[in-house]
């Protein structure tokens, strides 16, 4: 019997939510949100990050001023232990999710590589 792919996806969602890195991420995020200075700095970083992404998606040039502002925010973030822990944990979780994505995409990769060899 074939498994319903959506059921498998929900199982994966549950596994991610139960993952230790995800639990640590939630705790780290709560710690950032509970500290006014960390929260404001994190919000500033997210706003800057989204603004730069939007510019790139629209084909706009990232100016030297944009780069300088980004570097200044990143330098301040590196001084905040709560945000640093949050970002390190998020990075570890992103590696896991990237690995899962590679596994999920393997059948398509095999299909297309077999087509190219034919």
UniProtKB/Swiss-Prot annotation:
InterPro entries, alphabetized: Com_YlbF, YheA/YmcA-like_dom_sf
Disulfide bridge partners, by residue number: none
Transmembrane annotation, as ranges: none
Tree of life domain: Bacteria
A Pfam family assignment: Com_YlbF
Gene3D superfamilies recorded: YheA/YmcA-like
Record family assignment: Belongs to the UPF0342 family.
Name used for this protein in its record: UPF0342 protein BCE_0953
Organism from which the protein derives: Bacillus cereus (strain ATCC 10987 / NRS 248)
């Amino acid at each position: 019997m074939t498994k319903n792919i959506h059921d498998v996806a929900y199982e994966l969602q549950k596994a991610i939510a139960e993952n230790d890195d995800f639990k640590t991420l939630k705790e780290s995020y709560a710690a950032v949100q509970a500290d006014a200075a960390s929260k404001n700095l994190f919000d500033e970083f997210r706003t800057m990050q989204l603004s730069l992404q939007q510019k790139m998606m629209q084909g706009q040039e990232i100016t030297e001023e944009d780069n300088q502002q980004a570097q200044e925010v990143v330098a301040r973030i590196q001084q905040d232990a709560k945000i640093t822990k949050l970002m390190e944990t998020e990075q570890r979780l992103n590696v896991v999710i990237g690995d899962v994505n590679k596994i999920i995409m393997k059948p398509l990769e095999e299909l297309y590589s077999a087509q190219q060899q034919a």
